[in-house]
């Protein structure tokens, strides 16, 4: 699976389970001093209602020092911030880390390269967590 230009979503493979990928991401976030605002367990919530869903978790994270200038320049960018990483398992039991591409966020909100660099941590996190 690769980046889909029409959706702006980048899919990066992980060589770990969903749970291990999430734990790895949490450790990396903590080491980098990036705040984890929340972790949403979509599959866990589905199970509570009697529905089956492959493992799917969403991390919402950020650094107000990096995100605030972006939102000041483009208030509507707050709909995409804090940053998000979706960790999910496909039908073949392959695990993926998905996130909005920086180019998509830049085009969507008219952000300069300088402001986009504030959000580049999302790419680093996905790369580090998948290996």
Kindly give the residue locations of the regions a language model identified.
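Terminal, regulation- and interaction-focused segments at domain boundaries
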Residues: 2-33
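Short beta-strand element of the conserved SAM-dependent methyltransferase core
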Residues: 11-12, 59-62, 87
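Short Gly/charged-rich anion-binding patches and loops
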Residues: 23-24, 41, 73, 121
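Compact, glycine-rich, soluble single-domain proteins
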Residues: 37-83
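Beta-strand/loop substructures that line and gate deep hydrophobic ligand-binding cavities in soluble
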Residues: 84-109
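Well-ordered alpha/beta subsegment
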Residues: 107-131
